[in-house]
Protein backbone atom coordinates (compact mmCIF):
# COMPACT_ATOMS: atom_id res chain seq x y z
CA UNK A 1 0.00 0.00 0.00
CA UNK A 2 0.92 3.63 -0.42
CA UNK A 3 0.48 5.42 2.89
CA UNK A 4 0.57 9.18 3.33
CA UNK A 5 1.55 10.70 6.66
CA UNK A 6 0.47 14.17 7.74
CA UNK A 7 1.59 15.39 11.14
CA UNK A 8 0.61 18.53 12.96
CA UNK A 9 -0.50 20.09 16.17
CA UNK A 10 -4.13 20.02 14.94
CA UNK A 11 -5.25 22.55 17.55
CA UNK A 12 -7.86 22.25 16.08
CA UNK A 13 -7.79 20.18 12.89
CA UNK A 14 -9.50 22.06 10.03
CA UNK A 15 -10.07 22.14 6.28
CA UNK A 16 -6.67 23.77 5.79
CA UNK A 17 -5.20 20.43 6.86
CA UNK A 18 -7.79 18.14 5.33
CA UNK A 19 -8.24 19.53 1.81
CA UNK A 20 -4.52 19.46 0.87
CA UNK A 21 -4.30 15.92 2.27
CA UNK A 22 -7.22 14.87 0.10
CA UNK A 23 -5.61 16.47 -2.97
CA UNK A 24 -2.31 14.68 -2.29
CA UNK A 25 -4.16 11.40 -1.77
CA UNK A 26 -5.88 11.76 -5.13
CA UNK A 27 -2.79 12.99 -7.03
CA UNK A 28 -0.47 10.23 -5.81
CA UNK A 29 -3.19 7.56 -5.64
CA UNK A 30 -2.43 6.89 -1.99
CA UNK A 31 -4.40 4.12 -0.31
CA UNK A 32 -4.52 5.78 3.06
CA UNK A 33 -3.58 8.94 4.94
CA UNK A 34 -2.40 8.79 8.54
CA UNK A 35 -3.27 11.95 10.47
CA UNK A 36 -0.72 12.20 13.26
CA UNK A 37 -1.16 14.72 16.10
CA UNK A 38 2.06 15.81 17.79
CA UNK A 39 2.49 15.46 21.52
CA UNK A 40 5.43 17.76 22.20
CA UNK A 41 6.10 19.77 19.04
CA UNK A 42 9.83 20.67 18.93
CA UNK A 43 9.12 24.25 17.78
CA UNK A 44 6.06 24.98 19.92
CA UNK A 45 5.88 25.19 23.69
CA UNK A 46 2.18 24.97 24.43
CA UNK A 47 -1.13 23.93 22.95
CA UNK A 48 -4.60 25.31 23.62
CA UNK A 49 -6.31 21.94 24.08
CA UNK A 50 -5.14 18.72 25.69
CA UNK A 51 -3.50 15.88 23.79
CA UNK A 52 -6.57 13.73 24.49
CA UNK A 53 -8.87 16.39 23.03
CA UNK A 54 -6.77 16.81 19.90
CA UNK A 55 -6.66 13.04 19.44
CA UNK A 56 -10.42 12.84 19.76
CA UNK A 57 -10.97 15.61 17.21
CA UNK A 58 -8.71 13.86 14.69
CA UNK A 59 -10.30 10.47 15.42
CA UNK A 60 -13.74 11.89 14.68
CA UNK A 61 -12.50 13.42 11.41
CA UNK A 62 -11.06 10.05 10.37
CA UNK A 63 -14.38 8.37 11.09
CA UNK A 64 -16.09 10.90 8.84
CA UNK A 65 -13.65 10.59 5.91
CA UNK A 66 -12.87 7.54 3.78
CA UNK A 67 -9.20 6.56 3.64
CA UNK A 68 -8.07 8.51 6.70
CA UNK A 69 -6.77 6.98 9.93
CA UNK A 70 -5.61 8.36 13.25
CA UNK A 71 -1.96 7.68 14.07
CA UNK A 72 -1.29 8.29 17.76
CA UNK A 73 2.33 7.16 18.08
CA UNK A 74 3.67 10.70 18.54
CA UNK A 75 0.91 11.66 20.94
CA UNK A 76 1.81 8.67 23.12
CA UNK A 77 5.54 9.43 23.10
CA UNK A 78 7.01 11.25 26.08
CA UNK A 79 9.69 12.94 24.01
CA UNK A 80 9.85 15.56 21.25
CA UNK A 81 8.10 14.70 17.99
CA UNK A 82 11.17 14.32 15.80
CA UNK A 83 10.11 13.11 12.37
CA UNK A 84 13.04 10.76 11.86
CA UNK A 85 12.14 8.86 15.04
CA UNK A 86 8.52 8.64 13.95
CA UNK A 87 9.36 7.38 10.46
CA UNK A 88 11.62 4.68 11.88
CA UNK A 89 8.74 3.50 14.03
CA UNK A 90 6.29 3.62 11.12
CA UNK A 91 8.73 1.70 8.92
CA UNK A 92 8.65 -1.09 11.47
CA UNK A 93 4.85 -0.98 11.65
CA UNK A 94 4.43 -0.96 7.86
CA UNK A 95 7.45 -2.90 6.53
CA UNK A 96 5.85 -3.84 3.20
CA UNK A 97 4.26 -0.48 2.43
CA UNK A 98 5.49 2.70 0.76
CA UNK A 99 5.48 5.75 3.02
CA UNK A 100 4.89 9.32 1.82
CA UNK A 101 5.60 12.05 4.37
CA UNK A 102 3.58 15.17 3.54
CA UNK A 103 4.79 18.70 4.25
CA UNK A 104 4.32 22.22 2.99
CA UNK A 105 6.93 24.09 0.98
CA UNK A 106 7.38 26.37 4.00
CA UNK A 107 8.63 23.34 5.96
CA UNK A 108 10.68 21.89 3.10
CA UNK A 109 12.78 25.04 2.66
CA UNK A 110 13.87 24.69 6.30
CA UNK A 111 14.33 20.91 6.21
CA UNK A 112 18.07 21.14 6.82
CA UNK A 113 17.33 22.42 10.34
CA UNK A 114 15.39 19.26 11.21
CA UNK A 115 16.89 16.59 13.47
CA UNK A 116 18.87 14.09 11.30
CA UNK A 117 17.02 15.35 8.24
CA UNK A 118 19.02 13.36 5.69
CA UNK A 119 17.83 10.10 7.23
CA UNK A 120 14.26 10.98 6.27
CA UNK A 121 15.03 9.97 2.68
CA UNK A 122 16.15 6.53 3.85
CA UNK A 123 12.73 5.92 5.38
CA UNK A 124 10.10 7.53 3.16
CA UNK A 125 9.29 9.60 0.14
CA UNK A 126 8.71 13.30 0.74
CA UNK A 127 5.63 15.03 -0.65
CA UNK A 128 5.91 18.81 -0.88
CA UNK A 129 2.63 20.71 -1.16
CA UNK A 130 2.97 23.95 -3.06
CA UNK A 131 0.75 26.63 -4.51
CA UNK A 132 0.37 26.36 -8.31
CA UNK A 133 3.21 28.12 -10.14
CA UNK A 134 5.41 28.38 -7.03
CA UNK A 135 9.06 27.33 -7.45
CA UNK A 136 12.02 27.09 -5.10
CA UNK A 137 14.47 29.92 -5.70
CA UNK A 138 17.65 29.08 -7.60
CA UNK A 139 20.58 28.78 -5.23
CA UNK A 140 18.45 27.79 -2.25
CA UNK A 141 20.22 25.15 -0.11
CA UNK A 142 17.40 22.64 -0.74
CA UNK A 143 17.36 23.18 -4.51
CA UNK A 144 20.05 20.54 -5.11
CA UNK A 145 18.16 18.00 -3.00
CA UNK A 146 14.94 18.73 -4.86
CA UNK A 147 16.59 18.45 -8.28
CA UNK A 148 18.39 15.22 -7.41
CA UNK A 149 15.40 13.47 -5.88
CA UNK A 150 12.44 14.93 -7.75
CA UNK A 151 10.10 12.31 -9.17
CA UNK A 152 7.12 12.67 -11.46
CA UNK A 153 3.63 11.33 -10.98
CA UNK A 154 4.15 9.34 -14.19
CA UNK A 155 7.15 7.57 -12.66
CA UNK A 156 5.05 6.73 -9.63
CA UNK A 157 2.35 5.16 -11.78
CA UNK A 158 4.91 2.77 -13.28
CA UNK A 159 6.39 1.84 -9.91
CA UNK A 160 5.30 -1.45 -8.36
CA UNK A 161 7.82 -2.23 -5.62
CA UNK A 162 7.89 0.09 -2.57
CA UNK A 163 10.56 2.79 -2.81
CA UNK A 164 11.78 5.71 -0.72
CA UNK A 165 14.05 8.72 -1.09
CA UNK A 166 12.05 10.51 -3.78
CA UNK A 167 10.50 13.97 -3.62
CA UNK A 168 7.09 14.60 -5.17
CA UNK A 169 5.72 18.11 -5.57
CA UNK A 170 1.94 18.46 -5.64
CA UNK A 171 0.12 21.67 -6.52
CA UNK A 172 -2.66 22.29 -4.02
CA UNK A 173 -5.50 24.77 -3.84
CA UNK A 174 -4.67 27.76 -1.60
CA UNK A 175 -6.23 27.46 1.85
CA UNK A 176 -6.64 30.71 3.74
CA UNK A 177 -7.33 28.95 7.05
CA UNK A 178 -5.21 28.65 10.18
CA UNK A 179 -5.71 27.19 13.64
CA UNK A 180 -4.71 30.54 15.14
CA UNK A 181 -7.43 32.31 13.16
CA UNK A 182 -10.03 29.72 14.19
CA UNK A 183 -9.12 29.99 17.87
CA UNK A 184 -9.34 33.79 17.68
CA UNK A 185 -12.78 33.63 16.08
CA UNK A 186 -14.07 31.22 18.70
CA UNK A 187 -12.64 33.36 21.50
CA UNK A 188 -14.68 36.28 20.13
CA UNK A 189 -17.83 34.18 19.96
CA UNK A 190 -17.72 33.72 16.18
CA UNK A 191 -18.46 30.30 14.68
CA UNK A 192 -16.06 29.42 11.79
CA UNK A 193 -18.40 26.93 10.10
CA UNK A 194 -16.60 27.08 6.74
CA UNK A 195 -13.25 26.17 8.31
CA UNK A 196 -14.21 23.08 10.32
CA UNK A 197 -15.87 19.76 9.65
CA UNK A 198 -19.28 19.69 11.34
CA UNK A 199 -18.13 16.89 13.65
CA UNK A 200 -15.18 19.02 14.78
CA UNK A 201 -17.27 22.11 15.38
CA UNK A 202 -19.77 20.05 17.35
CA UNK A 203 -17.00 18.64 19.56
CA UNK A 204 -15.48 22.08 20.16
CA UNK A 205 -18.83 23.51 21.19
CA UNK A 206 -19.62 20.60 23.51
CA UNK A 207 -16.18 20.81 25.15
CA UNK A 208 -16.21 24.63 25.19
CA UNK A 209 -12.75 24.61 23.62
CA UNK A 210 -11.09 27.91 22.69
CA UNK A 211 -14.00 29.99 24.03
CA UNK A 212 -13.01 32.85 26.33
From Swiss-Prot:
Q: Which CDD domains has this protein been placed in?
A: NMNAT (cd02165)
Q: Which InterPro entries match?
A: Cyt_trans-like, NadD/NMNAT, Rossmann-like_a/b/a_fold
Per the record, the pathway is: Cofactor biosynthesis; NAD(+) biosynthesis; deamido-NAD(+) from nicotinate D-ribonucleotide: step 1/1
Which SUPFAM superfamilies does this UniProt record tie to the protein? Answer: Nucleotidylyl transferase (SSF52374)
Q: What is its EC number?
A: 2.7.7.18
Q: Does the UniProt entry include the keyword ATP-binding?
A: yes
Q: Which UniProt keywords apply?
A: ATP-binding, NAD, Nucleotide-binding, Nucleotidyltransferase, Pyridine nucleotide biosynthesis, Transferase
Supply one GO molecular-function term. ATP binding
Catalytic activity entry = nicotinate beta-D-ribonucleotide + ATP + H(+) = deamido-NAD(+) + diphosphate
Q: Does the keyword Nucleotidyltransferase apply?
A: yes
Q: Name one Pfam family in it.
A: CTP_transf_like
One of the protein's GO biological processes: NAD biosynthetic process
Q: Which family does it belong to?
A: Belongs to the NadD family.
Q: Explain the purpose of this protein.
A: Catalyzes the reversible adenylation of nicotinate mononucleotide (NaMN) to nicotinic acid adenine dinucleotide (NaAD).
Protein name per Swiss-Prot or TrEMBL: Probable nicotinate-nucleotide adenylyltransferase
* Native source species: Shewanella sp. (strain MR-4)
Instruction: Write the gene name.
Output: nadD
Amino acid sequence: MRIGILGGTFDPIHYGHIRPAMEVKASLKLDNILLMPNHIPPHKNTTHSSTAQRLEMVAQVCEALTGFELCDIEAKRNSPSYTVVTLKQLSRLYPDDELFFIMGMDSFIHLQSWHKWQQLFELANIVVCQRPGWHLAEGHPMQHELSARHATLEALSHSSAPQHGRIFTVDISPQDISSTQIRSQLAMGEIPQDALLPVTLNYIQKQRLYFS
